[in-house]
Each structure stands twice: as structure tokens, then as C-alpha cells.
Amino acid sequence: VTLKKKTLRKVEVSAEICSEDHEYNMDWPSDITLWINDVEVGTWESPSDFGGRRGKLNPAWWSSDKTQYGMLKNWCVKRDGSFLDGEKLSDAGLEKYNISDKDYISVKIGIKEDAAHKGGINIFGDGFGDYPQDIVLKLSY
């Protein structure tokens, strides 16, 4: 994949995420999937809608009986495959995601219709949860 005479080596998407239930529920799994350009990268099974302690970054006005934090997940696509937190998910490399065929990169995080665990999703941004970041899309050349 080449963009302006540079070769793309890696695409990474990271975000603090967890399941979603009313208020919070420590036993509430959800199969959370990432797609790039409408091609599935992989699914992570979130174990919980995390609560029971305050998120490290949550503002004072955020009620303690609500979801508090998530887990920082990192999807990565390289030439030799697709990975989640360093573990290989598949052999699907950069070419499969048609990145050079478009003027943009589409990223979707959600729950598949046929997911075994349809426990919803919370996506945290900078200032909430435990990690001081928004959703990050990183391209490495």
C-alpha cells in the first residue's frame, strides 16, 4: 500500500472500551468487533461493563453507579496479518483492507448481529475511564 511515494507498514486502532449494561455489571460479556473499510479485523470478548470503583480520570460529576472504566485494546494490521494486543487474529494483511483504493479510511467499532455475546459497548474518551486518550488511528510508514 503506497501513499504519496511512501509505503504503509501498519495501521493501528486503539481505544478504551468495555461492555454496556444498565449502570454497570461486572458479569456482562460483549463481543466487540473492529472493521476497517467494512472488512472485519477481529473481535474481542469484553468480560464486563466495568464499575465498582471510580475511573481514574472520571470527572466528579460522573455518578459512581455508572460504568467507570474499560480496557485499552489495540488492533493492528500489518503486511503479515491482523493482531489484537499483539496476538495474531488472522493472516489478513494490509492489502485485504483496500486502504489504497479509497480517499479515506473507514473505522467501525460495534457488535455483530450474530455475536454470541451482545452486551453492547462503551467507548471512553480522554477525561473518562482509566486511559487519557480518545480513539486513536495511527498509520506507520
Predicted regions and their residues:
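Extended, solvent-exposed segments with strong compositional bias
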Residues: 47-100, 117-119
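Hydrophobic beta-strand residues in large extracellular and virion-surface proteins
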Residues: 34, 105-109, 137
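Extracellular and analogous surface-interaction loops
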Residues: 1-9, 94-100, 141
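Short, well-structured beta-strand segments within conserved domains
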Residues: 11-13, 93-95, 101-114
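Proprotein-processing/basic-patch segments
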Residues: 112-141
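Mid-protein regulatory/catalytic core that forms ligand/cofactor-binding pockets
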Residues: 1-63
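Short, flexible coil/linker segments at or flanking structured domains
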Residues: 20-22, 95, 125
